[in-house]
């Protein structure tokens, strides 16, 4: 609650109740007493909460006179002989020049990597740059098999329709006009957790109850809410309907499909935002000088499946914690550590490969192949055979990365060069996801594998979950494309431990 009040004091335009308190709406999976009943817990600014928060925090940066390097792209981390991070290499897009930025501390806040999939709610910039930088620097990526599909992406466009739609009372319908979530989740109905709703939608489509000429989408019905409520509480959703689906949601339902939205995995960190690694037999050894916050990090407060609204809380809480710790670290370390002699070697090798290329694969083509492979083999419902095939395909695509060619060798604002450099990040995240997913032979959270599904009352593996063998974090290393594991922390610092149990809705 403290960060919500802090945002409000910064000027965040939260919706208000008649008594002046901050408006809260129901959201998927938000319940009292571990699933007993739904509650109104999500603070909202109409259907633009994230957008409003972005502007509110940016205004605070302007106030603090933060120096932004606009239209620069960070390329690689610089680690010294002891493994400490002492800076980054970066490309200035306006000139095409390569720079070394020496730093006492580097914080990765690069967001998710949803653009490794063909259909994604993520912005085009979300190509996993921070994760790629960490992986190339020898840092493991944690729990990359766990990806959240949002139930309501606009069919054919991927644009997100906020969960606030269903929080305000919108319902999902199949081709029979049936509110089918009542069958799957009698208590929470359309506001069951996202992974569950996405799987139910996928099931309806697979069983022939999808809508449209190809029976390949579900309908989200909002018109019963009334035009006044829609324009007041869901103005952006109305605009999205008109612009991306040619639908007036005050009069007719809008086609939606489950769409990739969020990664639960990322760069492993502790509660201070410090990046941690396995070193000398210690699972969470701190990488000095390196922090990660937000979707690119894996603390892991979301476990295998995030609840709606918790990502913004995550980045606010741990962003603040990281900021405080960085100040302490910098106060204790007055001098910069020297840069190693090979500080820019990895980056120069990547850039020289593009500069010297005369023929080969276009970056856009390779990126498209990566996305198509991930969409096909790491979707809502997974099978062991499909994932194993995906591992082979991604390995073949990785072999093609070295042959990416750059026809336009110009320096100034060369977006083709940026896209080619982004492919290096896409392939790291895609391979981490595919290999980690194929190795986890159970169902847990957002990772549901058809081969391992069991009923909720199964004595050993309820809903396919195998705690004895698989209640552990996955660690994927780029070098050698290898996996390792570390135990889950079952002892929280300030609350009672909550053991895994069967989810009921």
What are these regions (language model features)?
Residues 1-13, 136-144:
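Conserved FAD-binding subdomain of flavin-dependent enzymes
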Residues 6, 10-43, 80-81, 173, ...:
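Glycine- and aromatic-enriched mobile tails/lids
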Residues 8-97, 102-104, 109, 150-155, ...:
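Conserved redox-cofactor binding core of oxidoreductases
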Residues 14-17, 68-71, 100-102, 108-109, ...:
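General beta-strand structural signal in soluble alpha/beta enzymes
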Residues 48, 94, 98, 117-125, ...:
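Alpha-helix capping and helix-loop boundary segments enriched in small/acidic/polar residues
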Residues 76-100, 247-299:
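FAD-site-proximal beta/loop scaffold in flavoenzymes
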Residues 105-159, 206, 308-325:
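Glycine-rich loop(s) and the adjacent beta-strand/alpha-helix scaffold that form part
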Residues 133, 139-255, 325-331:
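An anion/pyrophosphate-binding glycine-rich loop and adjacent beta-alpha core
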């Amino acid at each position: 609650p403290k960060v919500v009040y802090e945002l409000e004091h910064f000027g965040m335009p939260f919706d208000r109740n008649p008594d002046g308190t901050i408006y809260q709406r129901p959201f998927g999976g938000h319940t009292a007493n571990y699933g007993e009943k739904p509650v109104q817990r999500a603070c909202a600014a109409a259907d633009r909460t994230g957008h409003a928060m972005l502007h509110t925090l940016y205004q605070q940066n302007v106030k603090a006179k933060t120096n932004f390097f606009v239209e620069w792209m960070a390329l690689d981390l610089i680690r010294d002989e002891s493994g400490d991070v002492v800076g980054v290499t970066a490309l200035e897009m306006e000139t095409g020049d390569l720079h070394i930025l020496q730093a006492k501390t580097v914080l990765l806040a690069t967001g998710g990597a949803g653009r490794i999939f063909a259909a994604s709610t993520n912005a085009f910039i979300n190509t996993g740059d921070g994760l790629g930088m960490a992986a190339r620097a020898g840092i493991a990526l944690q729990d990359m098999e766990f990806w959240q599909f949002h139930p309501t992406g606009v069919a054919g466009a991927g644009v997100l329709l906020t969960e606030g739609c269903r929080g305000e009372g919108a319902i999902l319908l199949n081709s029979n006009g049936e509110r089918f979530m009542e069958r799957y989740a009698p208590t929470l109905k359309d506001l069951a957790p996202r992974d569950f709703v996405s799987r139910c939608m996928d099931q309806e489509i697979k069983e022939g109850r999808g809508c449209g000429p190809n029976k390949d989408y579900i309908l989200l019905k909002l018109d019963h809410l009334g035009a006044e409520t829609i324009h007041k509480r869901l103005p952006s959703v109305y605009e999205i309907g008109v612009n991306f689906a040619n639908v007036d949601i005050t009069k007719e339902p809008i086609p939606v499909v489950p769409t990739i939205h969020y990664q639960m995995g990322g760069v492993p960190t502790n509660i201070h935002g410090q990046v941690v690694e396995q070193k000398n037999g210690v699972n969470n050894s701190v990488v000095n000088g390196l922090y990660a916050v937000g979707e690119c990090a894996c603390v892991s407060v979301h476990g295998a499946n995030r609840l709606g609204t918790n990502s913004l809380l995550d980045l606010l809480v741990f962003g603040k914690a990281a900021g405080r710790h960085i100040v302490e670290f910098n106060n204790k370390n007055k001098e910069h550590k020297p840069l190693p002699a090979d500080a820019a070697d990895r980056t120069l090798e990547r850039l020289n490969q593009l500069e010297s290329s005369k023929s080969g694969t276009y970056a856009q083509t390779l990126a498209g192949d990566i996305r198509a492979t991930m969409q096909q083999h790491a979707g809502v419902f997974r099978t062991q055979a499909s994932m194993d095939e995906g591992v082979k395909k991604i390995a073949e695509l990785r072999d093609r990365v070295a042959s990416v060619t750059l026809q336009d060798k110009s320096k100034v604002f060369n977006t083709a060069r940026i896209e080619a450099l982004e492919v290096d990040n896409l392939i790291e995240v895609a391979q981490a996801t595919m290999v980690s997913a194929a190795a986890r032979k159970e169902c847990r959270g957002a990772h549901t594998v058809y081969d391992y599904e069991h009923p909720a009352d199964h004595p050993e593996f309820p809903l396919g979950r195998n705690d004895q063998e698989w209640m552990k974090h996955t660690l994927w290393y780029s070098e050698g494309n290898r996996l390792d594991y570390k135990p889950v922390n079952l002892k929280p610092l300030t609350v009672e431990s909550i053991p895994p149990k069967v989810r009921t809705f």
